[in-house]
């Protein structure tokens, strides 16, 4: 049977959505069709599982960037039997034509580019609103950054102890805590009811995974979680090769700057930082790295990068990129010392890496959406991209379809695993087994014309391996 979902002819009565413009649906559908040709992993899963419907009965609350590639993920989940409600995990990352195309298929989606923080948290609640009478709730979470998971857990804590939302430390927490207080007043017990129904969560990104491990360490993880980020076919491909292409796409769309000849500082030399450094060097920039980890710092030095501190670099470089997952990596003092027209941006999940709040007191001049001048009293200006949020999604369209197919194939397999076998898992964080990692890679080889060498029986015996894998031990680093 065909894995293609039949289009909805008349969606004029469908109102369970919030998108910028439904008239963009045809445009979105055309781009989705192109993306499908570049996402062999997801399309293979549709063909393999469409008849079996392994996600039948699953009601997935999805919080992940609402892009064209995510539309292919959503429709794959639906093809495999799931019901889905979706919101973006970033206020700037939605592609409005992608959201419209999903809404046109009568799939509830709540996302548009340029949401306010109030809308963002309202939409995060909406993905759990399965039935107005409370007869149905979400039973799975697909998360990116951990906000959907955090919302239910923090809200449940606040039902027992309102003091946990009494002292916000930043603007985002102010809005989140106010949203929770409002829901506590209007829907008593809503958070704990929804939390109790969740079988598990699959988490996409480094920052969200860090949150999950922290909860596990404290004994506060309420359900099993699968760490999709640390699948090799996610972290070593999406984080590295995806960022290698999408970082400079965002910078150049936003600024039209010539990168060749500039000094660019990449803060953080993990998988994301490695991809960013490669792309900037490839376009002719002199790349400097900042790092806290001696191993990563040594890797950077051995690749020929100069490893410095932000204090060393802030008054010398032209472009600054944060890729750490930390907070206040670029401080107020750093920005005050930067050269006129220096460009600063972030490619980590949250907007905490650049201390944007500290420069709100200065004059801001909007150049175009997600591109601003901050004008200091001296008259010097710096260019801030996407208000310190994800530059590749705020100023461009994120990673290419092919590399997202690898990540999202892991997500689908993780959802199937938790939905079908969740009772076998404890309230811990797990990683998909090596055999599935290798399966994801295999599904993408044909598109690139790759031919694998097959072990002979003699070779397999010599290496003590199954001819069909897995080929590496779990601790192998790649």
Swiss-Prot record:
UniProt binding sites for NAD(+): 205-207, 239, 268-273, 291, 326, 347-349, 392
Protein's pathway: Amino-acid biosynthesis; L-homocysteine biosynthesis; L-homocysteine from S-adenosyl-L-homocysteine: step 1/1
InterPro entries in the cross-refs: Adenosylhomocyst_ase-like_sf, Adenosylhomocysteinase-like, Ado_hCys_hydrolase_NAD-bd, NAD(P)-bd_dom_sf, S-Ado-L-homoCys_hydrolase_CS
One GO term of the biological process aspect: one-carbon metabolic process
GO terms assigned for molecular function: adenosylhomocysteinase activity
Residues the entry annotates as binding substrate: 67, 144, 204, 234, 238
GO cellular component, as recorded: cytosol
Database matches in HAMAP family: AdoHcyase
Official protein name in the record: Adenosylhomocysteinase
Species for this entry: Nitrosomonas europaea (strain ATCC 19718 / CIP 103999 / KCTC 2705 / NBRC 14298)
């Amino acid at each position: 049977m065909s894995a293609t979902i039949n289009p909805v002819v008349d969606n004029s009565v469908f109102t369970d959505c919030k998108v910028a413009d439904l008239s963009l649906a045809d445009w979105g559908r055309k781009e989705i069709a192109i993306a499908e040709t570049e996402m062999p992993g997801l399309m293979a899963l549709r063909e393999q599982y469409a008849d079996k419907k392994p996600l039948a009965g699953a009601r997935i609350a999805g919080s992940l960037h609402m892009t064209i590639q995510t539309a292919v993920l959503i429709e794959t989940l639906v093809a495999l039997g799931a019901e889905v409600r979706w919101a973006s995990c970033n206020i700037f990352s939605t592609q409005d034509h992608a959201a419209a195309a999903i809404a046109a298929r009568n799939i509830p989606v709540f996302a548009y580019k340029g949401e306010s923080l109030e809308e963002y948290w309202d939409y995060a609640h909406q993905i759990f609103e399965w039935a107005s009478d409370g007869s149905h709730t979400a039973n799975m979470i697909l998360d990116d950054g951990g906000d959907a998971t955090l919302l239910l857990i923090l809200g449940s804590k606040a039902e027992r102890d309102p003091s946990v939302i009494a002292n916000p430390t930043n603007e985002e927490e102010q809005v989140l805590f106010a949203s929770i207080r409002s829901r506590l007043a209007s829907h008593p017990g809503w958070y704990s009811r929804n939390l109790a129904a969740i079988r598990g969560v699959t988490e996409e990104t480094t920052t969200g995974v860090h949150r999950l491990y922290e909860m596990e360490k404290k004994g506060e993880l309420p359900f099993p979680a699968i760490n999709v980020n640390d699948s090799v076919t996610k972290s070593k491909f999406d984080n590295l090769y995806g960022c290698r292409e999408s970082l400079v796409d965002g910078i150049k769309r936003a600024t039209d700057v010539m990168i060749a000849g500039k000094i660019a500082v990449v803060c953080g030399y993990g998988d994301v930082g490695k991809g960013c450094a490669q792309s900037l060097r490839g376009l002719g920039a002199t790349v400097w790295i900042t790092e806290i980890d001696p191993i990563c710092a040594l890797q950077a030095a051995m690749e020929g990068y100069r490893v410095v501190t932000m204090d060393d670099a802030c008054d010398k470089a032209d472009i600054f990129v944060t890729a750490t997952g930390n907070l206040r990596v670029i401080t107020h003092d750093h920005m005050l010392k930067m050269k006129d027209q220096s460009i600063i941006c972030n490619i980590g999940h949250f907007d905490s890496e650049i201390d944007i709040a500290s420069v709100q007191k200065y004059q801001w001049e909007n150049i175009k959406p997600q591109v601003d001048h901050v004008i200091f009293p001296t008259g010097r200006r710096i260019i801030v991209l996407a208000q310190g949020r994800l530059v590749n999604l705020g100023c461009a369209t994120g990673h290419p379809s092919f590399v997202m197919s690898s990540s999202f194939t892991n997500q689908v397999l993780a959802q199937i695993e938790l939905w079908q076998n969740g009772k076998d898992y404890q309230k811990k964080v797990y990683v998909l087994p090596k055999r599935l990692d290798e399966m994801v890679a295999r599904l993408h080889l044909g598109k690139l014309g790759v031919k694998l060498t097959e072990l002979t029986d003699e070779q397999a015996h010599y290496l003590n391996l199954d001819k069909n894998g897995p080929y590496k031990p779990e601790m192998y680093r790649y």
